[in-house]
C-alpha cells in the first residue's frame, strides 16, 4: 500500500500529477486529490488498489477514477490546450495545468505533493509547502490517485472528441493512439497535415515547422 502522507502531521495534503504530457495531439490534463489520512473501511479497501495510472489497465483506471471521486475529501482536474502548450512551452503549460487543478479544489491544501520535477510557481500556491519528487505517483496515495484522475479525464476527452469527429479520429488514429506519436498517427500527419489540435511545438522535427 502506498504512503497515505508525506509527514505524520495535521497539514492538509494534496497530491497532483499530469497525464498527456507526451502526445502530439490534444490537451494536457492534471489531477489533484486530497485523501483522508484516517480512512474508513471502504477508503482503505480502495487505497489498496490505487497505484500509478501507468500500471493499471484502462478498465481498472476507469473504475478507480469513480471510486476516488466518491471517496476523496476533495478532488479536481485542470487542463491546458495545445495552443497554450505551443505558446508557453511544455514546462510552463504543465505548471499551468497544475494551477488549474488546484484552483478547482474547494479546500485549500497546506502541503502539495507533486510527481516529477516541477513546482507550482503561481500565487498563492507558490507560498504553500511543496514536496516535489520523481516517481511520487509510486510512493504517495494522493499523487497516484491524482495520476488516475488525470489519465482517465485525458483519455475520456479524446474518446468523446472521436465520437463527434470520426473523420479526424480516423485520419490520425486518435481512438487507438490517444494522441501519442504512433507510426500510423505520424503517417496521418504527413498525409493530411497537422490538425488545429496538434501541438505544433511537437511537430517541428517531423514537418520542419516553426511555431
Residues covered by each model-derived region:
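RNase H-like, Mg2+-dependent phosphodiesterase core
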Residues: 1-211
Amino acid at each position: 500500500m502506498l504512503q497515505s502522507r508525506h509527514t505524520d502531521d495535521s497539514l492538509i495534503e494534496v497530491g497532483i500529477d499530469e497525464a498527456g504530457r507526451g502526445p502530439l495531439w490534444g490537451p494536457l490534463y492534471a489531477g489533484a486529490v486530497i485523501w483522508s489520512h484516517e480512512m474508513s473501511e471502504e477508503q482503505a479497501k480502495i487505497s489498496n488498489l490505487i497505484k500509478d495510472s501507468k500500471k493499471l489497465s484502462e478498465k481498472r483506471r476507469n473504475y478507480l477514477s469513480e471510486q476516488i471521486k466518491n471517496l476523496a475529501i476533495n478532488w479536481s482536474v485542470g487542463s491546458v490546450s495545445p495552443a497554450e502548450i505551443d505558446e508557453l512551452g511544455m514546462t510552463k503549460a504543465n505548471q499551468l495545468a497544475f494551477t488549474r487543478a488546484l484552483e478547482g479544489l474547494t479546500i485549500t491544501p497546506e502541503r502539495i505533493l507533486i510527481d516529477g520535477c516541477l513546482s507550482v510557481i503561481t500565487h498563492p500556491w507558490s507560498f504553500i509547502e511543496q514536496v516535489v519528487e520523481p516517481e511520487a505517483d509510486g510512493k504517495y496515495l494522493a499523487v497516484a490517485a491524482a495520476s488516475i484522475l488525470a489519465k482517465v479525464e485525458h483519455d475520456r476527452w479524446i474518446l468523446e472528441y472521436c465520437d463527434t469527429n470520426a473523420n479526424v479520429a480516423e485520419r490520425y488514429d486518435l481512438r487507438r493512439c490517444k494522441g501519442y506519436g504512433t507510426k500510423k498517427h505520424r503517417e496521418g500527419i504527413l498525409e493530411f497535415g497537422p490538425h488545429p489540435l496538434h501541438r505544433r511545438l511537437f511537430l517541428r522535427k517531423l514537418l520542419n515547422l516553426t511555431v
